[in-house]
């Protein structure tokens, strides 16, 4: 009998081998196969697979504020998604008397979440050339039922960015899952798992495209006693902003300097084997257009 771990590993291995441009459809198809299996572990396996695979972010409009926000597993309850602008779920969650209410951050964390959304919206405007969408969601990590009144127990969250070029040839989704662990009254450790989902198409020629995802982790211990911070909450925002900026910078450099250079080496090797000069110039041009596509995101 195939073990649970073997099934999960096989599903993840299959996802890696399928066309990354169709990652959402591929994931849904595999989850459907798992559900149709009808085994006792089907539901758990489906949830683990969904949490292990990053898919392109979906944009939704907040019915109360009219602002767009990004949807992911971290702000989902059933088929509804919580807006960071109004702190309400849309579509409205239909709740029975015996059901638990949808999750919300504590009051103090919600206040920090509001400030974080405003701050990273400015970041998005500066670093994404005024385009795209950003959303930030925080949640309490304290397992006690009492309302959290301070951030002394730490918290977790996710920072999301999505941008698409005007002609649809380039799509960028970045997902930064964060965990904040206070080490002392004046220090905190920040753990960030950053994933980028990239899809670049050459509109002039369908023969060359680049799609896939990249994940990296970063961990730093930072001081909460900052001269520029009015309080601990502001210090957390400054530290998180610095960390996200560093992580995105590293990912962009890795994509452009490593993966695109590798793509060029592969193209050049193939051309030396079977191509001529005109073919080389044509492929160089297509590769250059893909690089420009990344730079425009």
Swiss-Prot record:
Which cellular component appears as one GO term in the record?
mating projection tip
Q: Which Pfam families match?
A: F_actin_cap_B
Q: In which broad location class does this protein mainly occur, judging by the first location in its UniProt entry?
A: cytoplasm
Keywords of this entry = Actin capping, Actin-binding, Cytoplasm, Cytoskeleton
Residues of the region (Disordered) are: 276-297
One MF annotation (Gene Ontology) recorded for this entry: actin filament binding
SUPFAM superfamilies given in the database record: Subunits of heterodimeric actin filament capping protein Capz
Looking at the keywords, is Cytoplasm present? Answer: yes
Q: Residue ranges under compositional bias (Basic and acidic residues)?
A: 276-289
Q: Which Gene3D superfamilies does the protein's record reference?
A: 1.20.58.570, F-actin capping protein, beta subunit (3.90.1150.210)
| Name this polypeptide is given | F-actin-capping protein subunit beta
Q: Which gene encodes it?
A: CAP2
